[in-house]
Design a protein with these regions (language model features):
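A structural motif
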Residues: 27-41, 58
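C-terminal active-site subregion of NodB/CE4 polysaccharide deacetylases
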Residues: 1, 49-168
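Substrate-binding clefts and substrate-entry loops adjacent to catalytic sites
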Residues: 38-53
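Active-site beta->alpha N-cap acidic-glycine motif
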Residues: 1-33
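Catalytic domains that recognize anionic headgroups
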Residues: 6-9, 42, 71-74
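A cross-domain feature marking catalytic cores of carbohydrate-active enzymes
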Residues: 9-13, 39-41, 79-81, 119-121
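Short, catalytically relevant binding-site loops at active-site mouths
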Residues: 14-17, 43-45, 83-84
């Protein structure tokens, strides 16, 4: 608000109001001041771990909660753990979402698949303004760092190399 900046926050709607999470009052105030809110499902459980009915419930009920609390349509979903299948995409579209986001770091272009969009994620914990600015202005470079770090970090013999690549 102070800097007149906007962004999108993805809510795990069953977590709203829990200690360490936003309250619906905070969400509403932020929404009224230009922040956008999307769904990150009810429970944050990967959608591909549910049967179709469970998937549908997570998608529809989370979307309804955001829309009811904010009085605005909810068009965005961030897939928990970035995981999705053809069935997840079908249920996402059926639930009325227009855009789906992964956990991959990167910028979005007009030609991108609207249900497989990269983002510039910020997870829990403090983030300095300098780090925030770096992530936004250098998101393409940041994406390369993130992907390189993840690639090298998952193999035992390259873990030492991963430690030399800064996590964006």
């Amino acid at each position: 608000k102070k800097y007149k900046m906007t962004g999108t926050i993805f809510l795990i709607t069953d977590f709203v109001g829990r200690p360490g999470y936003l309250t619906w009052e905070q969400v509403k105030e932020m929404s009224d001041n230009g922040m956008e809110f999307g769904s990150h499902t009810l429970s944050h459980r990967p959608l591909d771990s549910f049967d179709r009915n469970g998937m549908r419930h997570e998608l529809v009920e989370s979307k309804k909660a955001v829309e009811w609390r904010l009085g605005k349509p909810c068009h965005f979903i961030a897939f928990p753990e970035g995981k999705f299948t053809d069935a997840v995409l079908e249920e996402t579209q059926n639930a009325g979402y227009r855009y789906g986001f992964t956990v991959d770091t990167g910028r979005v272009f007009p030609w991108d698949d609207p249900y497989n969009l990269d983002r510039v994620p910020f997870f829990e914990g403090p983030v300095s303004f300098e780090h925030f600015r770096f992530r936004l202005t250098l998101s393409a470079f940041s994406a390369l760092l993130w992907k390189s770090h993840k690639f090298f970090d998952h193999m035992e013999f390259t873990k030492p190399l991963a430690k030399t690549i800064p996590e964006p």
